A protein has these predicted regions:
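HotDog/MaoC-like acyl-thioester-processing domains
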Residues: 3-18, 73-74, 85-177
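Long, compositionally biased, intrinsically disordered segments
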Residues: 15-17, 33-34, 41, 58, ...
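N-terminal leader/targeting segments and the first structural element of proteins
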Residues: 19, 23, 52-61, 67, ...
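A conserved, well-ordered hydrophobic junction motif at loop->secondary-structure transitions
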Residues: 25-41, 172-177
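Short histidine-centered beta-strand/loop micro-motifs
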Residues: 29-32, 71, 107-108
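Active-site helix/loop of acyl-thioester processing domains in fatty-acid/polyketide metabolism
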Residues: 37-55
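Conserved interaction-surface patches within small, structured recognition/assembly domains
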Residues: 59-71, 77-85, 100
């Protein structure tokens, strides 16, 4: 199916916003949010954006980048905003903006950014689930979407490297000779 026949959705149609308080059980030895917990929040939020855009089940193909910019302290809130920023035929890139807020002062800050790639899963085994094209609306969406092709090219280059790398990694148990 040619691109001109594909449905087009606005980035904002896939937008998801999820907010959590950083509780004592969520923190590491530095008294900041444990990175793995944030990764889980990001993947959860981004997967909803991808499903909302494609109206299908999705799987996480890769967490392409996660840049930690500012620690999220205990009793602050963490707000993840995600939306689709680029698509292939069955894949979708989702951008996540992670904002922190000091709930005592109201100070807000950019804590992290992330790009994740998802693949739409067809209901019928062996079929491909074509995803709609995406069109940005806001200044931020346009800025982020404009970089999609460059990020995709970088992912493809990295993917080739990692596929070759994985072929040389042993699957033997570490305690066997």
């Amino acid at each position: 199916m040619a691109d001109q026949n594909r449905e087009v959705k606005k980035s904002w149609e896939s937008k998801v916003i999820q907010t959590h308080r950083v509780f004592p059980g969520d923190i590491n030895s530095h008294r900041t949010l444990f990175g793995g917990r944030l990764m889980s929040y990001i993947d959860d939020t981004a997967s909803i954006s991808a499903s909302r855009h494609s109206r299908s089940d999705v799987v996480t193909a890769s967490m392409d980048t996660l840049d930690f910019l500012h620690p999220l302290n205990e009793n602050h809130s963490v707000c993840i905003e995600s939306y689709v920023t680029g698509v292939g035929s069955t894949s979708m890139e989702v951008f996540c903006k992670i904002m922190g807020e000091d709930l005592s002062s109201g100070e807000r800050y950019l804590a992290a950014t992330s790009f994740i790639t998802f693949v739409a899963v067809a209901k019928e085994k062996g079929k491909k689930q074509l995803v709609p094209l995406v069109e940005p609306s806001t200044k931020e969406e346009k800025f982020v979407c404009e970089g999609y092709e460059a990020r995709k090219a970088q992912r493809m280059s990295s993917r080739s490297f990692h596929e070759q790398f994985a072929q040389t990694i042993t699957d033997q148990l570490p305690w066997s000779n």
